[in-house]
Amino acid sequence: YRQNAQGEKEAVEWTAQYAEDGTTWTDTKPVWLTAFTASGTGGEFAQPCDATVEAQTGISNDLHENALKAATAKGSETTPYNLSNNTGGNTVENTANCYVVNAPGYYSLPLVYGNAIKNSATNASAYTSTVTGTNILNPFINHAGNGITDPYISGNGCTPAKAELVWQDAMNLVTDIKYNADSNGGNISFKVDRSSIRQGNAVIAIKDVSDAILWSWHVWVTDEDINNVIEITNHQNVKYNFMPVNLGQCDGNTITYEERSCKVKFIAGDQSKEITIKQLANVIATGSNAPFYQWGRKDPLYPSNGMGNTTKIWYDKEGIPSTANPMKGTFSAGNDCIKNCILNPNLMHNRYNGDYTYYNLWSADNKTTSANDNPVNKTIYDPCPVGFKLPASNAFTGFTTTGESVSSSTQVNGTWSSSEKGWYFYTNSEKTQSIFFPALGYRSYSTMRPGSIGTQGCFWSAHPVAKGNNYYLRTSSVDVQPTYMVDRGFGYALRPCQD
């Protein structure tokens, strides 16, 4: 404002100009300055001047990201690429709880429980069992605790209404998530944009009108050829074909966000004042990481950042970033634990012994508690993509000279890499090939926090030791336990084998 000759205060209108280079003034604000109060009527009292800036797309020289960006796009907005079909066609051929995306594009997935459709037909063996007993779940249950009788969610008295993101660990990795009503309950479609594609994980859920989650799926974006399997021979001379990386694996990466600044000049009459709006530079670095899983559950939990005992940055459905650990879920044993884990894929239950009931959650016909090489019958709770399943409890025994736990590196069939923080295990007695198992640590069921990142590796098998404990591979730089036993409440990594 100004005072006139009579001493009265008069409002003076003001406008703003911008100089992104600091010297050249213009009336047009920078494109990244998405909102700004650029003018006002003036007056005796201060007025708010608001500014918002557009989110940056970080700069990365990551080879995996570059390969994904260069890949030929799949599908279109009107005809998304069907992830349950080998060529993206309309027919539902093979389903899973995890779908792998390796290129930008538009995608869809059918509303089917896990692997309940195989080779274009109902796969009832994925949700029923041929064995009986108090520790056998039969049939498998859905979010309501009801036995599943049909592969399609809509065929079990459920009415899908909307789809939404639960979380993702790369910004704008999966967008435009939609529920599309159609036959067999419809499908979910989504977009993976070329500008933001990179290695990452997302969980997408289908909900009913009351906002209850009916089921959810893991979308893993990677350029890794997961079908380039590595054959290993265990101590019992049984062969397994392992995926070359962990489920949901993301390699270490550094993303740089450059500083942005702009001078703003406020002009009122013949006077002016200048300010500088500045968005500071930032660097986000991660080490090798992969999601954690509680035994018997289908949904991934947030990875660590791969560099310490800290959760990797993840984004909620509003795009808000966080490094918070999973929220705690306190459930009863048995079916209550299972159905509540389906309803709450973002929660980590704090029961040290998990459901504390069933032997067959990851192998439908299993009733055995001793370590073995029995065939694993993949279930609708198996987290693996099409063509893969969790390994039997003896799968890792070839990694030591005895087939059992050893506490000396001289008894390990492999070499420890201190730079990569993991074991290169020999895949056979000739030692002509190796397979890498990184020390990705674990997530605690009591604190919900990641631990032992870079020093310990933990990988679930499909088989239980008892109703609350399970076999897993445990590694450190000096010891390896191929059939170690632990409470099923822990969050561990997964190394799938070929189905």
Question: Where do the protein language model's features map onto the residues?
Answer:
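Extracellular/luminal low-complexity segments enriched in Ser/Thr/Pro
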Residues: 183-199
